[in-house]
Swiss-Prot record:
Protein family: Belongs to the 'phage' integrase family.
Any single biological process term in GO: DNA recombination
Keyword terms, alphabetized: DNA integration, DNA recombination, Viral genome integration, Virus entry into host cell
Species: Escherichia coli (strain K12)
Name under which the protein is recorded: Putative protein IntG
Tree of life domain: Bacteria
Keyword RNA-binding included in the entry's annotation: no
Length: 92
């Protein structure tokens, strides 16, 4: 296991959030310390969420159809609730 300067700093500062520690204390390192920068970049890349490079159009279309269906059901239900509550709201 390689221990970096930032690991030591975070341990001494009792930093529990590793990503926050690298973000804050990483700026303390000299800019020309390429080994430390490379180690930090490697560790930070472990926190980055993996993103798909491409999404098939049929997947997008399927999700859009589902979203449209949910929106349609929402509008119908909203109309039902408004119709049901409307007489109750205008009572004196």
């Amino acid at each position: 296991m390689v221990v970096t300067t930032s690991d030591v700093v975070m341990c001494q500062m009792r930093r529990s959030d590793v990503q926050g520690g690298y973000r804050v204390y990483g700026s303390w390192m000299a800019e020309n310390v390429q080994d430390q920068v490379s180690i930090l970049n490697q560790k930070l890349s472990e926190f980055a969420p993996s993103m798909p490079h491409a999404v098939r159009s049929d997947v997008i279309n399927n999700r859009l159809q589902n979203l449209h269906l949910h929106a349609h059901h929402f509008l119908i239900r909203r109309h039902q609730l408004i119709t049901h509550l409307n007489p109750h709201l205008h009572r004196n």
